């Protein structure tokens, strides 16, 4: 009996640890959260596989889908053309603001940026172009309910 309980416990631990792996094992992440009426939106890309989740405004969406190599190349080009690595963040203190964070873990655009305290004005257009590229991926692959 103890052996069966031990095996069941080990299986439960392994399954629960594996379910969190999707949130740490990614190449590119896009995260939008916060605000007076909080929302939590995550887009995690690992190779061609994408995990999307949205929670807020009375909705809860989770979706897995694939991106083509062309889609990934297009996203990488947008990051490069808009100098993702050179975007400068402002240092203002903001509260109850919806913030967006982008984290690129590999490739020439490797880096992490957030607009939690806004982006410096001369980089605002670049930042908006990058956000639009991620939003286009979401709009093309996730049907909002």
Model-predicted regions and their roles:
Residues 2, 47-48, 66-68, 103-106, ...:
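Solvent-exposed, well-ordered amphipathic alpha-helical segments
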Residues 2-8:
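Sec-dependent signal peptide recognition
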Residues 11-12:
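Repetitive helical segments and hydrophobic/amphipathic motifs
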Residues 15-16:
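C-terminal motif of bacterial Sec signal peptides marking the signal peptidase cleavage site
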Residues 19-35, 57, 85-145:
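Short, well-ordered, aromatic-rich surface patches in folded extracellular/luminal domains
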Residues 35-66:
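Post-signal-peptide N-terminal segment of Sec-exported extracytoplasmic proteins
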Residues 62-89:
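Mature extracytoplasmic domains of secretory-pathway proteins
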């Amino acid at each position: 009996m103890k052996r069966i309980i031990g095996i069941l416990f080990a299986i439960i631990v392994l399954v629960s640890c594996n379910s969190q792996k999707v949130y740490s094992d990614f190449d590119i992440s896009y995260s939008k959260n916060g605000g007076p009426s909080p929302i939590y939106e995550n887009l995690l890309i690992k190779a061609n596989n994408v995990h999307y989740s949205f929670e807020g405004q009375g909705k809860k969406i989770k979706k897995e889908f694939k991106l083509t190599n062309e889609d990934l190349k297009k996203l990488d080009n947008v990051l490069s053309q808009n100098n993702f690595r050179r975007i400068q963040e402002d240092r203002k203190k903001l509260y109850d603001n919806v913030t967006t964070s982008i984290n690129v873990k590999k490739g020439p655009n490797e880096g992490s940026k957030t607009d939690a305290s806004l982006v410096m004005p001369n980089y605002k257009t670049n930042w908006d172009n990058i956000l639009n590229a991620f939003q286009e991926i979401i709009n093309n692959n996730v049907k909002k309910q």
